[in-house]
Amino acid sequence: MGIRGLGLDICSISRIQRILDGPRAEPFLNRVYTEAERALCGRRSDAASAYAARFAAKEALVKALGAPPGIRWKDMEVRRQGGAPYFALSGVALEVMEARGLEAFLALTHDADVAAATVVLQSKGD
């Protein structure tokens, strides 16, 4: 039945770079990103941009869902297939999406020092 949620988030790439360069890098990466995301982003020359875009994507999805209690960062994995980003969900994120009959559409971008993500939630079958 049309659009059911919209989320937008921006993330400072330099902020993520400072975290990656600092003593909190490992705890941050372990808490926020799945192993697959870390493997993909960590081998890129623009790792901070890749991490920032995924951070923004996860924040945007949480906003689109209305910040359901119990959702965890690793419940939301950002993947790419054929160039288009999408979510592979688990845990509370998956439970909420299935209970509400939703599917998510994700757009990512970055320029200069900013990464941004937009998430549109739509009822399945629309």
From Swiss-Prot:
The keyword Cytoplasm applies. Its cofactor is Mg(2+). It is an enzyme of class 2 (transferase). Pfam families: ACPS. Mg(2+) binds at D9, E59. Gene3D superfamilies: 4'-phosphopantetheinyl transferase domain. One of its GO terms (molecular function) is magnesium ion binding. Disulfide bonds: none annotated. Its EC number is 2.7.8.7. Its main location: cytoplasm. NCBIfam families: acpS, pantethn_trn. Belongs to the P-Pant transferase superfamily. AcpS family. This is Holo-[acyl-carrier-protein] synthase.
